[in-house]
Amino acid sequence: MFRTIYITIIRGNMGAAFSFFDWAFGRGKQAYILILGLDASGKTTLLNRLKSNEGCVTIPTIGFNHETISYGRLTFSMFDIGGQTQFRRLWHHYFENCDAIVFVIDSNDVQRMSIAKDEAWSLLNHPMLKDIPFLFFANKQDLPHAMKKAQIIQKLDLLKIRQREWSICESCATEGFGIEGGFDWLSKNL
């Protein structure tokens, strides 16, 4: 019976054959990921680094950027949503069916760390995001006054997170540092 199905699929559509084998052998799971954070935290740079492994000059995101990226055995459908105040009010429109949140923090922006904390906890407490993993990137570690991971955990009260998987990684999206480790963790927790 298996041979018959296999031959029928191959003759009918090669794409269907590959989809069948991806399904049969556990490859190709798609995860819907939101990349959120305050404006100028490095969300778009991080997404571009994942997409092409190259840094590039970005401009403030008006609305959102979407990329589909293969990462190991997963396919990430990633939405990088603008972090300006007017766009943060719209984030909730993207929460349905979300599999994980990537929250990017500008580690050098001490003045807005309390705003980042409020936004992070608003997400952590949102009922539509209950039980999904959160990956925090302490970004811009290349800057001389960037706070380290331990300081950001303290400033954002992340040790109070309960009943969900979470991790924080120091990163520099412009250089690509720390991103792979974070997404390896995320892949294992989806």
Placement of each model-derived feature along the sequence:
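TRAFAC-class small GTPase G-domain
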Residues: 2-3, 7-190
